[in-house]
Amino acid sequence: MRIKLISQLFAAVGIAGISVAPFLMAPPSPPPLPIEIPVEPFEPKAEVKKTWQCPDCKPEEQYVLAELQKHTRITDRNALATIMGNIQQESKFISNICEGGARVSYDRCYSGGYGLIQWTSVNRYNNLGKFCKNYGCDPSSLEGQTRYMINESVFQRYLPMFEGSGQTIAQYMTPAYYWLGWGIKGNRELYAYDYVKKLKHMV
């Protein structure tokens, strides 16, 4: 009996020994402060588009080259070089040139071809003037003639043949002939090969 009482006493003392009064307990640690993570808005990367450029060309050539790519789906270097070579043969990219070499305004060229591609037939020549009258451009200027050249129905008719790819300069000369209807071929094909060497695919 005495042993049992002693055991109960020790058990009570043990429980009391491990009990701690509430006022002696350390206060709980506060929760950690939230960490602010900066959120950056998602901005999709702009597509970087490469185009054919001609760093060594004259400003007039560079302008026409850029406009052709901006307003058509021509991406093939040979196709662009063919068009450029033909313009070089026709006018050397001089917009106010009348056939024979005279530099005159649109209404002062009385015979032969006129302008970038030497518009010769009465209808095509007159349509240049009508186009610029309707759209507020100068038919003697590089800008006005380039706009008309790209939008002219004859060019639009053969444009799909230039918008393909993988053809040679000689092959692209076929739609170029249908487009321009030249009488003398001259050096247009040689000029085209020269442009192929000068065109660079750049951002």
Residue ranges and their predicted role:
Residues R2-P41, Y125-V203:
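Non-catalytic cell-wall polysaccharide-engagement segments
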Residues L68-Q69, C132:
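Hydrophobic alpha-helix position signal
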Residues K70-I74:
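Helix-boundary and loop/linker segments of multi-pass membrane transporters
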